[in-house]
């Protein structure tokens, strides 16, 4: 489906170059303007004001106005339960090319929230209740030409694109679920671009003149939950296990250096002081042994476990 408010399909629309947001993250994880040229927050931190870029048109030729953005946001909040998990507006007001979003409590990261593909801007004037294989009208460099769920999507150049003439006239996106199969398809020349490959596939393409490898720092954190029942109901055992886990070695050896040891739910790519955080359960095998000893656990056979 191409319904942007359903599950995470808005990511597909954005990745295909069709959808755009008011703001976006650059390759270094820093926020930058997109459909909004600039923004500021009120003194009481409750109202964010966005200046909508002049001269932008939807792919159908309709102008992008603050009123159009407001209507798109209202549709998103109406149809998506996830939207209020980012922030809950008490009002959205459009005036010319200025959009004001007010919340009951300060939301310091509201602009960052609007970079999520869920908040991509669509033209609601077509009054479509639900997009399935028919595509929403957006402002990106490409428009949907054909879409067959789980098989492929074809996009063509948006002649009304505000950011200059897109480089390719047409692009076909194939749905290849298996990462290894994607890598083989790229290697054979069946496809020209592949993303989200396994780290072990990287070595297959390194050093090849006709292959361009691009890497970006992720905005995601991966979290492993511990079972807090049974044997692991003892918090001392859980803490010892954490301190016995060499996350740095795991990231370097098993993930080929493509990950950073975590110490908080928020990754270092987001500006929340990750580098200043202290990991209370960093790798410390001696501390792990001490915790186990105090809790009454003994290494009866001397194998270190």
Annotated model-derived regions:
Residues 91-93, 145-154, 172-229, 236-240, ...:
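Extracellular/periplasmic solute-recognition and catalytic clefts
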